[in-house]
Amino acid sequence: LILCYIPTNLCNLKCEYCLVSQVDGWHERKDIEFKYPIEHMIKAFSKERLGGECFINLTAQGETLLYKDIVALTKGLLEEGHSVEIITNATVTKRLDEILSFPEELLTNLFFKCSYHYEQIKDKKIEGIYWSNVKKIKESPCSFTIELMPYDKIASSIPDLCERCKKNAGAVCHATVGRDDATNGKNLLTKMSKDEYVNTWSVLKSDMFKLKMDLFGKKRKEFCYAGAWSLLVDLSSGEASQCYGRMNTQNIFKNLNKPIQFRPVGYSCMQPFCFNGHAHIAWGMIPEYNSPSYYNVRN
């Protein structure tokens, strides 16, 4: 599992629960400097260097499809033989169409996580664009999922958002869990009690939501293989860490002849809980934890 972080803030939506849109210049194209060209990055992620085929997640701080080199990067990773996941709000049609024009043998290894920003798009022109693009993906050889960010303001709209999902995508969306990163304990991003929050959003019957709430606020003390079986890589520099909650420990772009160090977190996790467990525990980073598979939390 390779988690690629693209540190670009540019986004075309302004969501009140998102930290990116709270900073000045969030909607302006101010591309940061990427130290290495795409061709170099692809070589850094070669199957030989990584030890085989990997599942590679591409996530920008803003909208991933607005990263200027996302098409070339995605194609290069697929051609290398990896499976690729793109996190997107599914509204950047031009880039999406370019990607969907790839050969079928590449698209079968491509997965889109389409974030459903219900309040920001409902009954607006952009909602038509969103569902049109979701349908394009559905009709392609790619895989996809719809994921909602649940928050208090839209709790009363659950029946409506479920109906829109069923009508346009064929199934009710999954749900993630919002957290308040301004708090040391990464508290739930809600004014509800935990029980009320769970009862409210469990109606979606999302395995993603259930797993994240099962993990929420519970310190993991088992041996964790993140770092041995996964990496988090900053694509602007090549700096890499074992997971989201660790400091960078190596640069995997600087010297392509230098072996990548795969060292597990083990018993030394310092986080209050595994806040992105769907991206680690669902992939088996803690083998003794009886987790649903990544397939289940995304299907």
Regions found by a protein language model. Name each.
Residues 1-21, 55-59, 230, 234, ...:
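N-terminal pre-triad scaffold of radical SAM enzymes
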Residues 2, 22-35, 52-66, 80-95, ...:
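Core AdoMet radical
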Residues 4-25, 34-48, 102-106:
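Short, compositionally biased "basic patch" segments
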Residues 20-32, 278-288:
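Iron-sulfur (Fe-S) cluster-binding segments and ferredoxin-like electron-carrier domains
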Residues 32-44, 70-72, 96-99, 124-135, ...:
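Well-ordered, non-membrane alpha-helical segments in soluble/globular domains
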Residues 45-49, 78, 99-109, 131-139, ...:
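Acidic (Asp/Glu)-rich catalytic clusters
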Residues 109-111, 122-212:
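Conserved C-terminal portion of the radical SAM core fold
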Residues 181-299:
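Accessory C-terminal segments flanking Radical SAM cores
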